[in-house]
């Protein structure tokens, strides 16, 4: 059965791959992003999801054509790199405004229609990094963790209407995410540390999972009748970090994280 699917952040990266993949399957796919996407496989509607009025307009346009919304994939987001000490309020607010508030606004706008239908599926794209504080990505981890907690709370609130909702935690995916990160100015005390971690971070992305594999995973997830609150997708070496955090002594776990992020041999 063909579905009406809304995906945010579709001008590039994971969102673009998702939209094209489901478009090829014959679904009616609408991509929302600030820049209009160049694709014949889905309908692109320029939308800044940090502005609720723009979301309202986009959803109204979609409903005028389809009169239903089956699936929302909240994919739009950005990264942020830099030391906590070096970060400033404006950068932090910009990050949370997209990664958290934008996603919440999307859910609140589609919810009335899904409630009327007594059906719907919502996937909030999160990160394996939401389960831990990543060095020099602390606010990114925090923004995704905040979305996870909203997702958990909302699952209780909407359980009466047969609407499925989950967080999908991704590991490193091979995309151009580095181009869209907020990069905080690095102060002198952190320069030697930061650039080693930053180089390692980019290498992990360059060797990450192909975006189409995310689409295939989501395709299988959408076939499930009852969802868990959290799903995890990525390389084993990244996913295993989540249970290890709770199994290992804290100092041992922190040393593993330092090694993974190329921090063990850093001299200040």
Kindly label every feature range from the protein language model.
Residues 11, 19:
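N-terminal Rossmann NAD(P)H-binding glycine-rich loop of SDR-like oxidoreductase domains
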Residues 47-57, 89:
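The beta1-alpha1 cofactor-binding region of Rossmann-like NAD(H)/NADP(H)-dependent oxidoreductases
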Residues 83-84, 91-93:
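Substrate-binding pocket helix/loop in short-chain dehydrogenase/reductase
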Residues 107, 143-146:
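Active-site helix of classical SDR
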Residues 107-108, 152:
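A short, exposed helix-loop element centered on a Lys and neighboring polar residues
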Residues 127:
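Residue(s) in the substrate-gating loop at a strand-loop-helix junction
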Residues 156-205:
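C-terminal beta-strand-loop-alpha-helix "lid" module of Rossmann-like NAD(P)-dependent dehydrogenases
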